[in-house]
Amino acid sequence: MCWEMRPQLGTTRRAIWRSWPVLCSHHKLPTSPHSANKVAMATASLPPPEKRNKKKKKDTVIVISGPTGAGKSRLALEVARRLSGEIISADSVQVYRGLDIGSAKPSAAEMSLVPHHLIDILDTTEDYSAGSFFRDARRVTEDVLDRGSVPIVAGGTGLYLRWYMYGKPDVPQSSMDTTSAVYSELLSFRESGQWEEAVKLVARAGDPKALDLSVNNWNRLSRRLEIIRSSGSPPSAYALPYNSFHEQHDAEPTEATTDGKCEASKLDYDFFCIFLASPRIELYRAIDLRCEEMLVDTGGLLSEASWLLDIGLHPHINSATRAIGYKQAMEYLLYCRQNGGESTPQEFLQFLAKFQSTSRNFAKRQLTWFRNERIYQWVDASQPFEPVVQFICNVYHDRDARAVPESLEMKRESCIHKTQDLKTYRSVNRVFCGDDSCSHILDWIRRTQRK
């Protein structure tokens, strides 16, 4: 089912449509020459009949997404370079200053090639939400279009992209009384570390999806309970203005759920959305290697995690410290600090394995999420780079050529099948292959983590 959009999200001077005056046939024409002249001039100023009701063409926004490690940043950079575009980051971690390696932030050299936005805009002590991204990204999109450039939104944070295109859901705001009451209701659970009991309370109150929250995400749990206490309904009752995730997943295939045309016709921009994907085993291998590469340099992820601890932050207390990689690295370094800066090779490799596993699981969730976002066209990231870039550029110039060439297409179902191979998947490290390979990391820990 298609939902009607609320008032246009990005309305500016480009989006305003002024209708032409229409002269009704039953009105008598003035008889004076002066008046007749006016009518003739007004009639002459009308556009041809076939153009009078033609809507203004929407501005095009390119969206490039994909699971972690798929190569979306590289693709967005090259497309932006060729189309004179500007990149709007849709990454929930790249917004933070100082979190460079763990967020795979573009280098200074890469950012000098084309303008980048929503990178390094916050301190690590600040929280950032889908609502914040919606506000900021929409503003930047208007600015980019006003400059005559092409907005290219790139990132893998699915909720950010969903809100960006479809708008914010009409979730009720909590009153101060409700917020205070919920805080008191959950306080004893929080102080005693009874996360599971708190989740069960919220589930019993009417939100079983609370069971899916990541452990100790108290902010989101509190917000879910606030919505229930304020409205009597769970957050899922406040659907976004398009087919919800489960409606799309469970419904019989229709034109709307097959190609997203029903939803796209309601949107205020002409979104051309690409999702980069590759065979799951290849993706997992790439993710495992990427995790190793983030740790091989002592000035990399571990150094950034150490800095977060030094400024008084702890794992999982805000958006920055909940981020994959940083959370695991902070927990590992806290353990090392408690042991006087000592760690065995086995402990380091266990931390690495946990980092890799969490990253792969996140990629799996991304694939599941985007498989049900029908506005995206899936492209095989394992194919040669140049044809993919050329396809996107061609589509931008010719909106009728949006079908992905068969040679580049990745079937959504191909990321579901071959489950037997995935069940037997095992990480094979290519950098940290034995005890000696991590000796420089352990030396660095010994020097810097004696706190």
Predicted features by range, described:
Residues 3, 17-20:
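Tryptophan (W) side chains
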Residues 91, 119, 156, 224, ...:
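Residue-level signal for inorganic ion chemistry
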Residues 52-59, 73-154, 158-197:
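N-terminal phosphate/diphosphate-binding loop that engages ATP/GTP or pyrophosphate donors
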Residues 158-293, 302, 306-314:
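Long, charge-dense, solvent-exposed interaction surfaces that engage phosphate-rich ligands
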Residues 10, 20-84, 248-451:
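Catalytic core of IPPT-family isopentenyl/dimethylallyl transferases
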Residues 100, 107-146, 187-239, 306-307, ...:
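ATP-dependent small-molecule kinase phosphotransfer cores
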